[in-house]
A protein has these predicted regions:
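Start-of-repeat signature of ankyrin repeats
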Residues: 7, 40, 73, 106, ...
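Conserved ankyrin/ankyrin-like repeat signature
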Residues: 21-22, 54-55, 87-88, 128-129, ...
Length: 342
């Protein structure tokens, strides 16, 4: 039970490095199976995170606490899920862990309250593991985090940008299952494809998975969701249409949101073909043309005009007093330069 100077017991070191022989020897000589390191990690947490299945099995047989929890809210199962350790997850579930047990907000402010093993697997791109969780009874319609796993696919596939280019990349994940294939798995396991968000930012309240896929101009995902029964005409709570959010409503920073202008044009054409009203006006007095102005998309402006968007509808001030022209000219909240081409 001697600890290294970092506070790590010898058993934890053996578990972390995947040494079953050393683990057996230490346990047989009285090592405390639930001893904690300096940051309260246990040997089982380390073995689970690093995917050392044989060590995990040895520790469980020796009485390791499968529900040991860090201040972050992470248990051995959450460590295994985050790292995509499918075999370890199988073993922990067989040991009696509830597949739908969420991380509590009190213990982890970094994770969304209500995060479950399923949503954590989806967030990290482990779609085969997520399917394993579905087969073990994970609820595909769980909304304790504020959204379902089907909603999540839109931002997992095409994350909004941040300060660096790395923020634009989807998670590397594990396995060979694609996110589109996983969407079908979700529906096969009972996911409701037209579930609407109950809260969140104003522009996303009431959004369906298809609505959010439109927001990121993800035409391939939009097609998959349509095949699975998505209704493309469902508005959000603000009465915005999928076309409005595809062109830019609710996304006031050009570089910070997913979707290139080419992708937006493809999504917009698809939405018009599906019967979405090009002249829709939301509760804030905004139209698809306002969206194109917010995102500085001159080709989308021309596209809307070519498809007979009525100037008498879109050339009006929204509730903040801005027409699409004024928005493009930089007269909007924030430090925006005029987009002369728009």
């Amino acid at each position: 039970n001697t600890s290294l100077h970092e506070g790590e017991p010898a058993l934890m070191t053996a578990a972390r490095t995947g040494k079953p022989g050393a683990v057996k020897a230490l346990l047989s000589h009285g090592a405390k199976v639930n001893a904690k390191g300096r940051k309260s990690q246990t040997a089982l947490m380390w073995a689970a995170a690093d995917g050392h299945l044989e060590v995990v099995t040895l520790l469980l047989k020796a009485g390791a606490d499968i529900r040991a929890t860090l201040d972050s809210g992470f248990t051995p199962l959450f460590f295994a899920v985050r790292e995509g350790r499918t075999e370890v997850v199988h073993t922990l579930l067989k040991a009696g862990i509830d597949v739908n047990e969420p991380v509590s907000r009190e213990k982890n402010r970094k994770l969304k309250s209500g995060t479950t093993p399923l949503t954590l697997a989806v967030e990290n791109g482990h779609f085969e593991l997520a399917t394993t969780l579905l087969e073990a009874g994970a609820d595909p319609n769980d909304m304790r985090a504020g959204y379902t796993s089907l909603h999540m696919l839109s931002w997992v596939r095409k994350p909004d940008g941040g300060d660096g280019d790395d923020d634009l990349a989807p998670p590397t994940g594990s396995g060979i299952m694609s996110s589109a294939q996983f969407a079908k798995q979700l529906v096969d396991h009972g996911a409701r494809v037209n579930t609407r968000l109950k809260g969140g930012k104003l522009h996303w309240k009431g959004a369906t998975p298809f609505f959010l896929a439109s927001k990121t101009a993800d035409a391939p995902l939009m097609r998959v969701l349509l095949e699975l029964g998505a209704d493309p005409l469902i508005h959000n709570a603000e009465n915005s249409t999928p076309l409005m959010v595809a062109t830019g409503i609710g996304q006031t920073m050009e570089a910070a949101s997913a979707g290139t202008e080419t992708e937006i044009l493809e999504a917009a054409q698809m939405l018009l073909d599906l019967g979405v009203d090009i002249d829709g006006v939301n509760n804030s007095g905004e139209t698809a043309m306002h969206g194109a102005a917010y995102k500085n998309l001159p080709k989308v402006v021309l596209f809307l005009d070519d498809n007979n968007a009525k100037i008498e509808v879109w050339n009006r001030r929204n509730k903040k007093g801005s027409t699409p022209y004024l928005i493009a000219a930089g007269y909007r909240p924030g430090n925006f330069k005029p987009s002369y081409e728009t």
